[in-house]
From Swiss-Prot:
This is Adenine phosphoribosyltransferase. Belongs to the purine/pyrimidine phosphoribosyltransferase family. GO terms for cellular component: cytoplasm. Its EC number is 2.4.2.7. The gene is apt. Keywords: Cytoplasm, Glycosyltransferase, Purine salvage, Transferase. GO terms for molecular function: adenine binding; adenine phosphoribosyltransferase activity; AMP binding. It is found in: Cytoplasm. GO terms for biological process: adenine salvage; AMP salvage; purine ribonucleoside salvage. Catalyzes a salvage reaction resulting in the formation of AMP, that is energically less costly than de novo synthesis. Homodimer. Pathway: Purine metabolism; AMP biosynthesis via salvage pathway; AMP from adenine: step 1/1. Its main location: cytoplasm.
Amino acid sequence: MEKLEKLISTYENYPKAGVSFKDVIEIVQHPSIFRQLILEMAKSKIIKEAEALISIDARGFIFGSAISIQAAKPMIVARKPGKLPGELVTKKYSLEYGENSLSIQKKALKKYNSFAIIDDLLATGGTVNCVSELINNNNKKVVGLLVVAELSKFDGRSRFNFPVESSILF
């Protein structure tokens, strides 16, 4: 999707020095392109094989919600600290530019056995690895990952034993 690539901006030294941040948010300002992206992502074999989607805080929610509606699949969320009520499963992880943790509500995780992970971007794979470990540690299965953009120089996909699909490869 050539038009899609032109809508992804690069911000140097954000959120810290040495990081080249790819921002996919402009895609949602172009409804016809956004719609086409969601239609394509929702057709994925990964989505068809999953019982539910797990979208990652926060930009993953944008794409995950739209895919969830299009594919008629339930969506649960992996959130940053302090953002979810109730009993949680939580894991820390390292980022390209720091450390964080993600949580998933236990009751949401218990309802389904197989998940497609949805996020905006794959770089080192730290965030996705955190979510996949949360899923696997609860005797559930990750059937694959869908991202809008992938930064191939980080080879994040090599960390996973499940399929990875990206709409744009940088």
